[in-house]
């Protein structure tokens, strides 16, 4: 389902201009990919990162994507699994761990999530659930822990000339989400985004 490269070529003979044959060469992407990188940022310091992707996890058509980023003042580890599409729906789930120590604020966060994305023409919707635990330690202030179970619904319309390389059109997005004390959250909340 994934391509490493696609090369399209034509015969450049002007005599064939009315009906020129087109040659298409497709190379399938490797089913597994590992990557490594290093860099430096002025606000988080030196970093190294590793990534791994498997486009056919457990030989079931599941896409697996994971990454580890270690910076001097921030670290992150994630793993996501995308199940094969079923009709217009695509389900996914994942886990995330993040830790940071920036400007006197230490944050340690773990999250589990699941989502269903549905595509109908140029309209994409997503319903997502996320369970998150955070430890927050501000310098000179008491630390605290928070727990959140949130639900989020996203509506997105893409009216562009080319989804992969748009040159004209627009994208509209609207999100609504929230959590409740009665359902594992420390606070009742509602949020909107557009």
PLM segments and residue spans:
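Gram-negative/organellar outer-membrane beta-barrel architecture
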Residues: 1-175
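Generic detection of long, well-ordered alpha-helical segments
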Residues: 106, 186-187
């Amino acid at each position: 389902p994934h391509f490493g490269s696609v090369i399209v070529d034509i015969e450049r003979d002007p005599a064939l201009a009315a009906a020129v044959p087109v040659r298409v060469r497709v190379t399938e992407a490797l089913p597994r990919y590992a990557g490594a990188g290093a860099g430096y940022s002025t606000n988080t310091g030196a970093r190294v990162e590793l990534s791994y992707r498997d486009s056919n996890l457990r030989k079931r058509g599941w896409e697996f994507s994971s990454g580890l980023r270690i910076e001097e003042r921030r670290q992150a580890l994630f793993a996501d699994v995308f199940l094969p599409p079923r009709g217009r729906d695509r389900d996914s789930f994942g886990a995330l761990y993040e830790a940071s120590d920036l400007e006197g604020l230490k944050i340690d966060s773990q999250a589990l999530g699941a989502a269903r994305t549905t595509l109908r023409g140029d309209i994409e919707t997503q319903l997502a659930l996320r369970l998150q635990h955070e430890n927050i330690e501000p310098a000179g202030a008491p630390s605290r822990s928070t727990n959140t179970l949130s639900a989020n619904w996203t509506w997105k319309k893409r009216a562009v000339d080319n989804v992969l390389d748009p040159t004209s059109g627009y994208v509209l997005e609207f999100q609504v989400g929230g959590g409740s004390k009665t359902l594992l959250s420390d606070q009742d909340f509602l949020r909107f985004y557009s």
